A protein has these predicted regions:
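An N-terminus-focused feature that recognizes amino-terminal "leader" regions
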Residues: 47, 62-65
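Vicinal oxygen chelate
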Residues: 2-22, 27-35, 66-72, 76-78, 90-117, ...
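A cross-kingdom feature marking solvent-exposed beta-strand/loop segments within repeated
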Residues: 17-22, 26-28, 52-53, 60-62, ...
Length: 161
């Protein structure tokens, strides 16, 4: 079993009240890496009845992505991620790990404040400043080595939550 082990700064004997709150609002989505986006959308639709509520290509990250929802599509989503180019993070993930769960994402009101709160706890984030995510959102990621092996994404929606 993987032990959740933050950096040494996060292990100091301090209480959580010493740090600013991260203020997670909800589970936003679970990301699944797939080699073929269209085939994966069809599989999730035919097998589980999920419907595609958003689809785009993020050139900056080199990924084709689709958000799949249940019912009216307003709850937690499944995000399918397929490489748009061979040097993308998703292509490297697929080469290393094969298809499957790639990330867990939380909605936050302010991605920079959440990142600062996590850094204050000694956790590393992948980006110094937020990047553009799905639908114009702003995102950052907690390094998986600081989150029990899970790539945690922080998502600030493009519109007010």
């Amino acid at each position: 079993m993987t032990e959740i082990s933050p950096t040494p700064a996060a292990r100091d004997n301090v209480t959580s009240s010493t740090f600013p709150d991260v203020e997670l609002l909800r589970i936003d989505h679970v990301g699944v890496a797939v080699p073929d986006l269209d085939a994966a959308i069809q599989f999730y639709a035919e097998t589980f009845g999920l419907r595609c509520v958003h689809q785009e290509t993020n050139e900056e990250q080199g990924v084709r992505e689709a958000m799949l929802g249940v019912g009216d599509g307003t709850g937690t989503k499944i995000q399918l991620l397929a490489p748009a180019r061979p040097d993308s993070a998703i292509a490297k993930f697929l080469d290393r790990s094969g298809p499957g769960l790639q990330q867990l994402a939380y909605t936050v009101a302010d991605v920079e404040a959440a990142a600062a709160a996590l850094r204050a706890r000694g956790l590393r984030l992948l980006y110094d400043t937020p990047k553009r995510g799905t639908g114009g959102s702003r995102i950052n990621f907690v390094h998986p080595k600081d989150a029990g092996g899970v790539l945690v994404e922080l998502v600030e929606p493009a519109t007010a939550v």
